[in-house]
Design a protein with these regions (language model features):
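Short glycine- and hydrophobic/aromatic-rich loop-to-beta-strand nucleating segment
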Residues: 66-68
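Intrinsically disordered, low-complexity polar regions and short flexible loop motifs
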Residues: 161
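Residue-level signal for the nucleotide or nucleotide-sugar donor/cofactor binding architecture
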Residues: 2-3, 84
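Non-transmembrane alpha-helical segments in soluble domains
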Residues: 5, 9-12, 16, 90-94, ...
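Conserved hydrophobic/amphipathic secondary-structure segments
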Residues: 58-59, 70
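C-terminal cap/loop subdomain of S1 sulfatases and analogous C-terminal strand-loop tails that border
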Residues: 34-57, 74-78, 82, 87-158, ...
Length: 192
């Protein structure tokens, strides 16, 4: 963290020195949580209370912080808990740069500027994740996770169980079926 903090500090200082501070959008985020190496008998990092880590679709692998700086446009020190996905970066940057979102092409991400600027809460949405054998769907407080294609999905309530330890699939078949159907529809759409 010290090296990262120092490196980002140098970039920000150079932007200040060159007079580009107010014209530059700085985004820092990670694409995954810390690598755990449990499969090699090592636990070299901790994402607690989140489950597991990088290259998984458990919260420890996909719930990561993002820091965005754009003086004059985004209020410094604002903390926003709205979930974002890397696909949101392109439409958000287009909007921040004053450009129109393409009408002839569907973007998978959404413009998150209203949420980032604390102007409005983002519309409820469904997030889909696929990595190797892992599949996951998140809608609101619920998250569906499948470790392998031939295994059943597990259902978690992230508001009550951020560590993803209690599978609610049998107790909440309605939500399970809704999210499974959403995943099947998304999978079909992606394949087309």
């Amino acid at each position: 963290m010290t090296a990262l903090d120092s490196a980002i500090g140098r970039v920000l200082k150079q932007l200040d020195t060159s007079g580009l501070r107010d014209k530059t959008i700085v985004i820092w985020y990670s694409d995954n949580g810390a690598f755990m190496l449990k499969d090699r008998g090592l636990e070299v990092a901790s994402n607690k209370p989140l489950r597991d880590g990088g290259v998984t679709l458990w919260e420890g692998g996909i719930r990561v912080p993002a820091i965005i700086r754009y003086p004059g446009h985004l209020k410094a020190g604002t903390v926003n808990q709205s979930p974002l996905i890397s696909l949101d970066i392109l439409p958000t940057l287009i909007t921040l740069a004053g450009g129109p979102l393409p009408a002839e092409r569907i973007l998978d991400g959404q413009d998150m500027l209203p949420a980032l600027a604390a102007q409005a809460a983002p519309e409820p949405r469904t997030f889909f994740f696929q990595y190797r054998n892992f599949s996951a769907v998140r809608r609101g407080k619920y998250k569906l996770v499948r470790i392998k294609p031939n295994q059943p999905f597990m259902l978690f309530d992230l508001e009550q169980d951020l560590s993803e330890t209690t599978d609610l699939a049998e107790r909440n078949p309605k939500v399970l079926n809704q999210l499974q159907q959403a995943y099947a529809d998304w999978e079909r759409e992606v394949a087309e």
